[in-house]
Every structure is written in structure tokens, then in C-alpha cells.
From Swiss-Prot:
Cofactor(s) the protein requires to work: Zn(2+)
Keywords per UniProt: Aminoacyl-tRNA synthetase, ATP-binding, Cytoplasm, Ligase, Metal-binding, Nucleotide-binding, Protein biosynthesis, Zinc
Protein name (database record): Cysteine--tRNA ligase
Similarity comment: Belongs to the class-I aminoacyl-tRNA synthetase family.
Organism placement in taxonomy: Bacteria, Bacillati, Bacillota, Clostridia, Eubacteriales
Family matches, as HAMAP family: Cys_tRNA_synth
Gene: cysS
Keyword Methyltransferase annotated: no
Motif 'HIGH' region boundaries: 31-41
Presence of the UniProt keyword Metal-binding in the record: yes
């Protein structure tokens, strides 16, 4: 099955055909670094990390570019509030970004360009637009003239008339059209600035991504991604700038956007003040669980945030980790191979079926939610095999390797515990070892009441004991 993805530009699923066979160029709009990123931003970051990983799994050579907006009105305002240099503040939050990104198991981008390192490229594009009559300068500001580009609005599906009717923009003497947007902003006292043909100033937000993506990926690159809130105006304006500068040449071939994360059915955003940063959530849940939660719903479907859903995600991840642990225990045991060839073949077939179903789900617009089902089915097959043949390695090695590999494609290390810290998992193992030892002593003394009490209380806590000829084993429900 060929890989198909939903292209926002065409509003339908399309077969993915890269610009260059075997290679993929991807660009996603990274954070504006004036604070820790919130879990709504985190969804976008995790989604496109997952997409990148799956493309790598399919054998593509992926160049993944994700920028940092390190100069912006919000950064300047935050710097003024804290009495700090805005560029230093942005650099500090870039460092904090990488800490939270590591917790979510985000692969570092191939290139992480910063806006302030690419001012010359932005100026070059603005000059080109001005030469073509697509931009105009007013007292040190430069604006893009949207009515000079007939295709403006093609990504969002809006006409210029509709935009003007719904615009919350006051028509001032400076703009020729209320929808015209800033390419370059004249410097205000106390703000960072760069020299330009229009005087001292700084770039507008939209020009930054156009310049950086074109520099590192060239025109017609494969995938441009971001959150659904960026379709308009940010991505619409990126297209206008880039394709205007390129004389109509295609800027990016596939546009992908994830749906909003909501709280009580209301979009999560910093502007609304109804957000949680990933840093805050990491105080209560590990990054693996947050990631598992974010990918448990198809990326184009809205996702409502609450603790209960995170707890369910933690249990789901623990189920997969338990399957790996049981497989490792069985593979590490000494004893006779008690499984027959048929049972081993059945487990190998389950592994092959899981791989097929996983690929089918992911090839259908990266349906990670459906891909989860293939992992859980394989986990169940491993558990059943280990229970029936506790000393057998027949087919188990392949099944274990397949489960681990497919989970890794989604960015999960099933050897890493889903609880708050590695030490917590080790302590659980140690406590269970002690309890099983106490229970074994009770059974040896024929103290069945104590033995059953331990078993029943553990069951109430979601821990199931199984008595086997080789001793008691425990699993998380």
C-alpha cells in the first residue's frame, strides 16, 4: 500500500510522491521562545516527530528542519517585563525547549535554524518582492500587497473579500489593504534591530519561516507542517511571500496540520490563558506517557486534555512494557524448550500480522491510533505464549523484536518505564520480590490465609499473581 497523506492545500488524501526519489524534505514551524511550550504545541511537535520517524522506517532519507522564532513582539514584551535582553531570554528558552523535547523523546531536527541568524536571507526575499511590485515600504516598514497576488488565500480557501469582511484590522494610512502584512518592521526605541535598505528594523514573523525553509530545503520541498491554527494567516502568508519571490514556483508540495488540543472543548492557547506547559505536566507524568497520550488520537482529530486520559495512556503503555518484560524473562530462563513448532509459528505469524497492520494504519495518513491496536494485539499474543510456554523461546524472539521495533517507530522505548522515574520501577520490582518471598514463606508454612490476603490485596491494586510450578509471577493488569 502506498503512503497517503491529507494535504491541506487540496483538502483530500493524496499519494505521497517526494520531490526526489528516496529523499524527503520537511519543515515545521518551531516555537516562539518566550516561555516553556505548552502541551498544545507539544502535540504538533510529537506528531511531526512521529511522521519523520515513520518516513525513516520506510527507508527515506529525511532532512527535517524546525526553526526557532527568537525575535518577535512577544519575546520583546517578555524581556521588557523581566528587565532582560530579549535575545538572551530567547536563547535561554531554546535551552529549556531541548530539555522538554528530550523528555518527549523528540529527535533533534537535522537543522534547528534561528530567525536572527537569517536576517540577510529575509532581506533578500523582501527586496525581490519589492522589485516585483508585491511589497511596498512606508516610513521604514515594508508590507506585502496581498491584492497583487491573485492566488492569495488558496491554502485556507478564503477569498480576499471574505478576509476583508471578517478582518479585525483597522484600515490605516500606512496600509494599502487591511489584509496587507508586515515583512519588515521599523525599529522602536529600545528594541533589537538590524540594518536594512529600509533603515533599522526587524523582520515580521511570516518572512522568517519562508526564508529559512527555502535556504535549507529549496523550492518545492516535500512537507510543510504545523498546528491547525497556523493555516491562516501564517502559512497562507508564507506561501504568498515565497511563491511571489519565486515567480509562482511551488513553495511546498504537501501541507499538513494537526488539530487543536482542547480543555473543556475550548482550544488551548497562551492567549486564552487555558494552557498547561509540558514542563508542568512532567511534574506528574513522564514524557513517554504524555507522548503516548498525544499519539493515541489521529492527528487531525481534536483531542481534549485531562488527567484521566493521561492515566489511561499510562496504563496502556505499561501493558506494552509488561509484554516486553515477560518476553525478556522467558528468553532469560534456563530450561527445556517446551513449545512445539506450531505454537512458535503462530507467534511468528502474529508478529508478521502486526507489522502488516501497523504499516497499513500508518500508510493511511499516519493513523497512529489504529497502529496502537496492532501493538496491543501482538502484546496479547506474547503474553499468551509466555503463559503457556514459560521456558520457550520458539518464535518469541521475533515477536519481542517486532513489538519493540514498531513501538520505537512511534517514539517509544518499551524498556523505559511509564511511571515517574526509572528508580520508581526498580522499587516496584524490589517490593514485589519481597512480597513474593513473604508469600512463599507463608505457603510453605501452609498459612493459606496470609497467602490469599497478599494475592487479593495486590489484585485490588491492579497486580495479578499467577502461581506456576516454577514459582509465582506477577503482571500489571
Amino acid at each position: 500500500m502506498a503512503l497517503r497523506l491529507f494535504n491541506t492545500m487540496s483538502h483530500q488524501k493524496e499519494e505521497f510522491k517526494p520531490r526526489e526519489e528516496g529523499k524527503v524534505g520537511m519543515y515545521t514551524c518551531g516555537p516562539t521562545v518566550y516561555n516553556y511550550f505548552h502541551v498544545g504545541n507539544g502535540r504538533m511537535l510529537v506528531v511531526f516527530d512521529m511522521i519523520r520517524r515513520y518516513l525513516l522506517y520506510k527507508g527515506y532519507d529525511v532532512t527535517f528542519v524546525q526553526n526557532f522564532t527568537d525575535i518577535d513582539d512577544k519575546i520583546i514584551k517578555r524581556g521588557q517585563e523581566e528587565g532582560r535582553d530579549p535575545l538572551e531570554l530567547a536563547q535561554d528558552y531554546i535551552g529549556e525547549y531541548f530539555k522538554d523535547a528530550a523528555a518527549l523523546n523528540l529527535m533533534p531536527a537535522s537543522i534547528h535554524p534561528k530567525a536572527t541568524d537569517h536576517i540577510p536571507e529575509m532581506i533578500e526575499i523582501i527586496k525581490g518582492l519589492e522589485e516585483q511590485g508585491l511589497a511596498y515600504a512606508v516610513d521604514g516598514d515594508v508590507y506585502f500587497a496581498v491584492d497583487k497576488l491573485p492566488a492569495y488565500g488558496k491554502l485556507s480557501g478564503r477569498t480576499l473579500e471574505d478576509m476583508q469582511a471578517g478582518a479585525r484590522v483597522e484600515v490605516g494610512e500606512r496600509k494599502q489593504n487591511p489584509m496587507d502584512f508586515a515583512l519588515w518592521k521599523n525599529a522602536k526605541p529600545g528594541e533589537p534591530f538590524w540594518e536594512s535598505p529600509w533603515g533599522k528594523g526587524r523582520p515580521g514573523w511570516h518572512i522568517e519561516c519562508s526564508a529559512m525553509s527555502l535556504k535549507y530545503l529549496g523550492s518545492g520541498f516535500d512537507i510543510h507542517g504545523g498546528g491547525g491554527d497556523l493555516v491562516f494567516p501564517h502559512h497562507e502568508n508564507e506561501i504568498a511571500q515565497a511563491e511571489g519571490y519565486l515567480h509562482g514556483e511551488t513553495f511546498a508540495r504537501y501541507w499538513m496540520h494537526n488539530a487543536f488540543l482542547t480543555i473543556n472543548q475550548q482550544k488551548m492557547s497562551k492567549s486564552l490563558g487555558n494552557f498547561f506547559t509540558v514542563r508542568e505536566i512532567l511534574e506528574h507524568f513522564p514524557g513517554e506517557v504524555i507522548r503516548f497520550y498525544l499519539l493515541g488520537t489521529h492527528y487531525r482529530s481534536p483531542l481534549d486534555f485531562d488527567d484521566e486520559n493521561l492515566q489511561m495512556a499510562q496504563k496502556g503503555l505499561e501493558r506494552l512494557q509488561t509484554s516486553i518484560r515477560l518476553a525478556d524473562e522467558a528468553l532469560g530462563r534456563q530450561g527445556q524448550n517446551s513449545a512445539d513448532a506450531a505454537s512458535g509459528q503462530k507467534l511468528r505469524a502474529a508478529a508478521e500480522e502486526a507489522r502488516r497492520e501497523f504499516a497499513e494504519a500508518m500508510d493511511d495518513d499516519f493513523n497512529s491510533a489504529l497502529a496502537y491496536a496492532s501493538l496491543f494485539e501482538l502484546g496479547k499474543a506474547i503474553n499468551a505464549h509466555v503463559q503457556a510456554y514459560p521456558y520457550s523461546s520458539e518464535g518469541l524472539l521475533k515477536a519481542r523484536a517486532t513489538l519493540w521495533e514498531l513501538a520505537d517507530v512511534l517514539g517509544f522505548d518499551l524498556a523505559k518505564p511509564a511511571n515517574q522515574a526509572e528508580a520508581g520501577n526498580q522499587k516496584l520490582d524490589q517490593v514485589m520480590e519481597l512480597l513474593l518471598e513473604v508469600r512463599a514463606i507463608a505457603r510453605k508454612k501452609k498459612d493459606w490465609e496470609m497467602s490469599d490476603l497478599i494475592r487479593d490485596r495486590l489484585k485490588d491494586l491492579g497486580i495479578v499473581l499467577e502461581d506456576t510450578p516454577q514459582g509465582a509471577r506477577w503482571t500489571l493488569k
